[in-house]
């Protein structure tokens, strides 16, 4: 598909973006045949296939200037000094990606009713911005949607506009 896109003159190319949701849910042919034959073995070739596919994809998509967004699941790696999050599917995606953002959420409550989520985005890898920075966004379930003012108090405190004293903000 990318080769066909590249054959068109640049003026005729419409903007394109690839989205893969979710990398962890992809299956290999070996995995499918093992499931059909009722074998309960783990597919050890999946991460190699993913690594090879992303090696080719990043080259082709880079030539065509096509962005790609991939979602994937994470799991906690326990055993090191500090537990860390790791992506499933091997290391191929980690090396191919220019930006890796880990998303997590917690419930936003009004009394006992859950009215939305606080979504935390942490940059684990970035070629465009500082790594290991967090951003929190509030998302309401009702018509309000994303809260555009969430986090401005903390940002003003960091900028020196006011101080947080005993849970209150003083100018």
Regions found by a protein language model. Name each.
Residues 164-171:
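Terminal-proximal interaction/regulatory segments of ATP-powered molecular machines
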Residues 43-159:
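Phosphate-binding/switch region of NTP-binding enzymes
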Residues 1-52:
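Conserved inter-motif catalytic segment of the P-loop NTP-binding fold
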């Amino acid at each position: 598909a990318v080769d066909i896109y590249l054959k068109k003159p640049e003026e005729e190319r419409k903007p394109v973006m690839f989205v893969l949701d979710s990398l962890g849910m992809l299956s290999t042919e070996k995995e499918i045949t093992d499931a059909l034959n009722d074998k309960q073995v783990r597919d050890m070739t999946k991460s190699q296939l993913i690594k090879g596919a992303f090696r080719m994809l990043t080259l082709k998509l880079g030539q065509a200037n096509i962005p790609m967004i991939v979602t994937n699941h994470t799991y906690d790696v326990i055993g090191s000094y500090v537990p860390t999050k790791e992506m499933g599917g091997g290391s191929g995606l980690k090396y191919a990606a220019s930006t890796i953002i880990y998303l997590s959420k917690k419930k936003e409550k009004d009394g006992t009713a859950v009215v939305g989520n606080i979504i935390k985005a942490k940059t684990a890898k970035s070629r465009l911005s500082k790594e290991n920075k967090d951003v929190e966004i509030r998302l309401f379930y009702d018509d309000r949607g994303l809260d555009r003012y969430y986090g401005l108090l903390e940002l003003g405190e960091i900028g020196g506009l006011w101080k947080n004293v005993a849970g209150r903000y003083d100018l």
